[in-house]
């Protein structure tokens, strides 16, 4: 089972169980599934995100980052989390290289992206995810396991950072390996 299939399973079978606890606040599986559905509708209907499009995220670890990841997976889009500890020039390089259609930024990082001035990338606050309810319930797209899901960058120790695409299958195998290693 892939990310959204697992979320759907747990939201159906244990809707009130805790999926995420962040800063002392619990989010149930049903609430997380609702947020993902809302974000999926926002991304597809209001932002025009389709399979293969890249969606970047700049911010600290936050539940919204996971919501965007799950929404991207359900649309066949590619999630591109950006390291929150980089310099402006490094962000400029990564955005030019990754060519995201859209970049979500936490408010504390939005000015950095606006200063870079890459007019090809729409920059939105993570708060926008839930601003406009979807006109209809946009269900998940059927996405093959070979579809790229995650675009991450190497540290660039021997030069510029290099983009690495991970498929849905690769992400799932990593999750399963972590479950085995950490016994959860």
Where in the sequence are the language-model features?
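Structural core segment of the AMP-binding/adenylate-forming
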Residues: 45, 74-141
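Conserved AMP-binding/adenylate-forming
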Residues: 25, 40-86
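AMP-dependent adenylate-forming
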Residues: 5-28
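Structural detector for helix-capping/boundary residues
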Residues: 30, 53, 89, 101, ...
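Conserved AMP-binding A3 loop
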Residues: 28-30, 149-176
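Conserved pre-ATP/AMP-binding loop-to-beta segment of ANL
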Residues: 15, 136-153, 160, 183-184
